[in-house]
Every structure is written in C-alpha cells, then in structure tokens.
Amino acid sequence: MASFSAETNSTDLLSQPWNEPPVILSMVILSLTFLLGLPGNGLVLWVAGLKMQRTVNTVWFLHLTLADLLCCLSLPFSLAHLALQGQWPYGRFLCELIPSIIVLNMFASVFLLTAISLDRCLVVFKPIWCQNHRNVGTACSICGCIWVVAFVMCIPVFVYREIFTADNHNRCGYKFGLSSSLDYPDFYGDPLENRSLENIVQLPGEMNDRLDPSSFQTNDHPWTVPTVFQPQTFQRPSADSLHRDSARLTSQNLYSNVFKPADVVSPKIPSGFPIKDQETSPLDNSDAFLSTHLKLFPSASSNSFYESELPQDFQDYYNLGQFEDDNQVPTPLVAITITRLVVGFLLPSVIMIACYSFIVFRMQRGRFAKSQSKTFRVAVVVVAVFLVCWTPYHIFGVLSLLIDPESPLGKTLMSWDHVSIALASANSCFNPFLYALLGKDFRKKARQSIQGILEAAFSEELTRSTHCNSNNVFSERNSTTV
C-alpha cells in the first residue's frame, strides 16, 4: 500500500482538512482521552503506589496504569500531528519515540491483562499452590519481563521511522529500503500534476554534471538521445559514476512512482554518460526512443542496459518499474503488521477469553457460585474494554494490506483509519473510571475515599474465598473418611 500511519503499523493518516468529520472525531477522542486519562491514571498511580498496601493485584494494575499514563503523555504530540495534517515539527527522535509509545502501550497492556487473566485462573483452580507461590516479588518479576518484551516489539519503529522533507515541511514516516511511506501522503500532491519526471524520481546527475563533449571519444555502443538543446550521443556509463550517483537515489521517495510520458520529461543528462560531439537529427517520437534505449519506463522491451556492471542499488532503481507497479506492500511492513496482530491481539485474546470462560464455568458449578470478587469483575470488564478499543485498529491494519488505497473502499478506509488509532488510544483513559464505577452501590462508593475505592477494586477477596472453600472441602473429606 502507499501509506502507513505515524502511530501504528497499518495505515498513514490521509491528508484531510482539519474540519473533515473523521479528523474532528479523532481530535475530540484524543483531547478527551488526554484530559481525562492524565489526571485519572496519575491519581490511581499515586494512591495505589504510595498509599495502599502492596499486593499482587496492586502490582498488576499499577503497571497497567503506568502503561496508560505513558500513552496519555504522548497524546498532545499525536493531536498536533493530526491538526497539522501530517507535518512533523518535533525532529527525528520524537518521530521514533511517539509512535513507539503507543505501540509500547498496546503490547504492555495486552501482556499485563493476559497475566492478570492467568493469575485469576490460577487463583480459582490452584488455590493451595497460589497460597505458597503467589507473591508480590513474583508479580514484579513478571511485570519486568513484560516491559522488556513490549519494548522489543517496538524496535521496528526505531529502525524504520525517519524524517522526510516535502514541500518544505518535515514528515515522519516509515522507510523500508527504497520503499518509503510518509504520513499524510496526499499532502504531497498528485504526481501526475507535475510536469517533470524529476518530481517523482530524480535521474542520476544534474544538468551541471554535463561533461565536455570533446573529453570522450569512443564508439562503444553509442546511445543517441536528442534533447531540446542540442543533438547528443550518450555513451555507456561507468560503474563508478553510477555508484556515485545511485547513492542519491536512496533518499528519494521511490515507493509510489508514476512515470510520465517522455515528452514531458525535462532533458537531464546523468553524470557518467560521456557525450560525443555528433550531429544527429532529433527524433519525432522521443518517448518511444527513450523507453526503448534508456529503459526509463516499464514498457521498454530492450534489455541492453548493462545490468551486470551496475551497483545493486542502481539496479534497484533501474528496475523501478517492476517493483511497485501493483502497489506491492513492503515485506517488513507485512511482517510488522502480522506480528502485532498475532502477538499483540489474537493470541492474548484467545488466552484471556479461555481463562475467564473456565473461571465462569467453575464458579457456576457450586461452591464458587456465591463468590462475588470485585477484582474478578474489574479484570473481566477491563479486558472487554481493551478488546473493543483495539479491535478496529487491527482490522484496519490488516485491511490496509489487502485493499488498494486508490479504490473507493481504500480511500474510505484510509480516511477513517486515524479514528481507529484514536479509539485505541482512548483505552488508556477508561481503566481508572472502571476501577471506581464497578461495584454494587456507586453512591456508597462515591462517599468513600479514593484509597478505599481502589482497595475494594484490587482486593484479594477471590483468593481468600477460594482458600476458605478449599479448606472446607478438605475438612469435609477428612470427616467423611473418619
């Protein structure tokens, strides 16, 4: 595809006026998320971290709150990036850091929620084991490992994110070798509206690189190319000159290249093409001649460009017409998207759904039916909200790999993609309110202190209840045996 987003793995935000409905909706969501999530998560972090007794449950939710708080701190940059239609005034470091924070929040949150689900499942099915092995130190070690893995999953953002310049504005986007994906790609304008091929792909060398016609005299495979200035004959370029000029190609945005007819190509002569002073008649059909002899266009049929003598990166440029004709998605981007989908969503979702299904089934069988653990309800609802917020993000990411961005469906998909990003970011502001609102009597909770609310939400009630029930069953079995 031709675009991928600044914050995400999937699609770049299209260049739309700030007053378009998708942009307005995204800005509203991001603004509310920041205004509510920053104080909410900060309050939970302060109370649960400094005022409450440290338990296994508080460790889980403290780290979850920390991940949400980091995401909220990055939202002003994302909001400004959206309002500026993709302009990036923050420099390269923040170009790598801000998108990675959102990805870090995704992986850290989903891994922590998976750990909480497994912990709840162990509490129900292995109460005796939990009494002996479930402790704060183990929970802290697991959280440390989760942060390390989440950071590793962000490495592609640091590797592939770069700053590009277009229309005197800095852009933050992915770059996969010669393939580049910038934020707000439509901001650059339609390449077909440009009147020169150099606006899309710069040929090696400039007009001031022309050599003195008398400096080279050779009859080795002359290529006659007329220009509007004077008739000239090009000689086969040397590998050294092509290697020097090809270095310039790596900085070009070669991902979505639209070749213009040769009659509108500005007559620039690549350096390293010696010129022999020879009178030649201009060709009437210059576009056909250029495509046949210089292989500038994908329709050319001649294979006499001496590929064996060209450096590899110049051969990549030479084969430009073949590697993006069908909007082929770069392989690294496919790998990043699929990895995030599987590791950051599908696999954890299956584990969490299975864990809570087993817990509900076990609780309905008898002795667990009366257990009303606030922590269990909090965990279930937090997982459900996470899935609701992040599902559109991953759906848009996969569809962006499959749908042509130039099709009507593709354009609609791209225009609403940043709404899915904003919705995913909004997940970071919900949890503090879920901790406070989940309970039988909200009015009673409203009269409690913040510390009392969090202590009730993060209580170890299920552990104690399960342990007591397990001891009762054990005692009943002993009395029956006697």
UniProtKB/Swiss-Prot annotation:
Assembly with partners or alone: Interacts with VGF-derived peptide TLQP-21.
Cytoplasmic side: 47-57, 119-139, 361-377, 439-482
Extracellular topological domain residue ranges: 1-23, 81-96, 161-340, 401-417
Gene: C3AR1
Post-translation changes: Among the sulfation sites Tyr-174 is essential for binding of C3a anaphylatoxin.
Name assigned to this protein: C3a anaphylatoxin chemotactic receptor
Native source organism of the sequence: Pongo abelii (Sumatran orangutan)
Residue positions, PTM Phosphothreonine: 463
Annotated InterPro entries: Anaphtx_C3AR1 (IPR001644), Anphylx_rcpt_C3a/C5a1-2 (IPR002234), Formyl_rcpt-rel (IPR000826), GPCR_Rhodpsn (IPR000276), GPCR_Rhodpsn_7TM (IPR017452)
SUPFAM superfamilies xrefs: Family A G protein-coupled receptor-like
Coarse class of the protein's main subcellular location: membrane
